[in-house]
Amino acid sequence: MTTKLIPAQQYHDIFVAGKPLIDLRAPIEFDRGAFPSSVNLPLMVDKEREKVGTCYKEQGQQAAIALGHSLVHGVVKQQRIDAWLNFLSAHPQAYLYCFRGGLRSQLTQQWLQEAGVTVPYVQGGYKGMRQYLIGVIEAAPSLQPLLSLSGMTGSGKTDFLKRRKEAIDLEGIANHRGSSFGKNIDPQPTQINFENRLAIALLHHQLGNHACLLLEDESFLIGRSALPQSFYSAMQTADIVVLEEDDDIRLTRLLDEYVHKMHRGFIERLGLEAGFEAFSHYLLQSLGSIRKRLGGKQYQELQDIMQQALSQQLNQNQTSQHLAWISLLLHKYYDPMYEYQLQKKAGNILFRGSHQATHEWLDNYQRDNYHRNNDPLNSQHSKG
């Protein structure tokens, strides 16, 4: 058998190219975390893996290998091979990987060669690639300056970031809009998958000629997705650009995000009746998540207004009353909290302005700092 191995030096290229990957680990391993371009076509399913693992602990490697062959043979073995071949027919450039790039990868490669197809497997497997991506995140703040985009809730930071080539949308990667009402209909990624996606986004960003990495000023937790500690710490010391927006535009934007888009999404997913029920639950549960911070009296006031707005929406198909609780939530909760947090970083603020003014400022910042960083005389002075 000819062993074809993809060395660890090619991890960068694998992730930047989005190379199709066959993950040979059991589903329980895959579900904890994998890579965006991977598909789970396991050599052994969960129960088979568990039996082999127990055998390995009690009787050693050779006995475990023998048990694995007895569990995956005949029709079962052929089904696994057929699944790999079907994927490879659509993705002939794919690579294999298991947990460490060991027996599972080698055995699968052998079976595929016997079926007439040679497929490389990745050195180090999942563990090696995962450690590489963790290193990418840890190194990122030292490679270029971080710039933090701040702004009150509803100021349109996410839409702004999507128009900037030097930006990475952390909330998009986390599939959560960051606030207590930021939950989306689809679930968030696992913590491992969030980190893997962030690392790959950083690799793509580093390919561009950007003077900085622009990120939204986030909390440590984006929903349930935790920013890696070293990366979050670097964000806390970054210079800040503050996006300013009129209150009426903020209210209209939040009405669209919290009410119109979420209502429409739930109905498309669940139908009219169940969709509205799920939408109502989303709003009331989101409000309930900040009950302690609001205090009993303010929470009850907001809940009453929200329930009235839901009733009006259900019976009259009108959403204007939602503006009442959104306005109260902004002015009594989000805005004071935002001002308090921003005041602690006031010394880091470089610029404040509207969407247009901030775009213009960032264009100038990008141009000036790019030329400075690529000036050979400046580089020479910085060295000595």
Curated annotation (Swiss-Prot):
Question: What's the EC number here?
Answer: 2.9.1.3
Record flagged with keyword Isomerase: no
Q: Which segments constitute the Rhodanese domain?
A: 15-138
Signal peptide region: none
- Please give the InterPro entries that the UniProt record associates with this protein: Rhodanese-like_dom, Rhodanese-like_dom_sf, SelU
Active site, UniProt feature = C98 (s-selanylcysteine intermediate)
What broad class of enzyme is this? Answer: transferase
* Gene3D superfamilies according to UniProt: Rhodanese-like domain
Q: Name one GO molecular function term.
A: transferase activity, transferring alkyl or aryl (other than methyl) groups
Q: Which UniProt keywords apply?
A: Selenium, Transferase
| Catalysed reactions listed for this entry | 5-methylaminomethyl-2-thiouridine(34) in tRNA + selenophosphate + (2E)-geranyl diphosphate + H2O + H(+) = 5-methylaminomethyl-2-selenouridine(34) in tRNA + (2E)-thiogeraniol + phosphate + diphosphate; 5-methylaminomethyl-2-thiouridine(34) in tRNA + (2E)-geranyl diphosphate = 5-methylaminomethyl-S-(2E)-geranyl-thiouridine(34) in tRNA + diphosphate; 5-methylaminomethyl-S-(2E)-geranyl-thiouridine(34) in tRNA + selenophosphate + H(+) = 5-methylaminomethyl-2-(Se-phospho)selenouridine(34) in tRNA + (2E)-thiogeraniol; 5-methylaminomethyl-2-(Se-phospho)selenouridine(34) in tRNA + H2O = 5-methylaminomethyl-2-selenouridine(34) in tRNA + phosphate
> What's a single GO BP term from this record?
tRNA wobble uridine modification
* Record-stated family: Belongs to the SelU family.
Q: What does this protein do?
A: Involved in the post-transcriptional modification of the uridine at the wobble position (U34) of tRNA(Lys), tRNA(Glu) and tRNA(Gln). Catalyzes the conversion of 2-thiouridine (S2U-RNA) to 2-selenouridine (Se2U-RNA). Acts in a two-step process involving geranylation of 2-thiouridine (S2U) to S-geranyl-2-thiouridine (geS2U) and subsequent selenation of the latter derivative to 2-selenouridine (Se2U) in the tRNA chain.
Q: Summarize the subunit comment.
A: Monomer.
Q: What's the protein name?
A: tRNA 2-selenouridine synthase
Q: Which organism is it from?
A: Shewanella sp. (strain MR-4)
